[in-house]
């Protein structure tokens, strides 16, 4: 599910466990990772996990992604919990890696 900067800020302020894939439409590695991120999200939903996975198109949220979250490359995955960033990686993660990261938040 795609999320906006306003929605993400609200979830961070509420202390929710969220993992976000930051992407652009022109990024080839982003396109490769998209179905794996979606599959990981579905598996976590099926497990009734309290961790939510979202995507954010940084072209639609440029100022927030670059100035606030300091995204420099895509794909970038960031995890948030307890009101702060607790995970950051750049590059492709496979489905099981995404799930492992999410469960460690």
Model-flagged regions — what are they?
Residues 27-30:
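Short cysteine clusters
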């Amino acid at each position: 599910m795609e999320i906006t900067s306003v929605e993400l800020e609200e979830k961070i302020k509420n202390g929710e466990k969220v993992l976000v894939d930051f992407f652009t439409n022109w990024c080839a590695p982003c396109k490769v990772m998209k179905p794996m991120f979606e599959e990981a999200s579905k598996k976590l939903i099926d497990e009734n996990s309290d961790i939510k996975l979202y995507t954010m198109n940084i072209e639609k949220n440029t100022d927030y992604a670059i100035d606030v979250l300091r995204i420099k490359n895509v794909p970038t995955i960031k995890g948030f919990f307890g009101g702060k960033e607790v995970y950051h990686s750049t590059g492709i993660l496979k489905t099981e890696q995404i799930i492992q990261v999410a469960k460690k938040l």
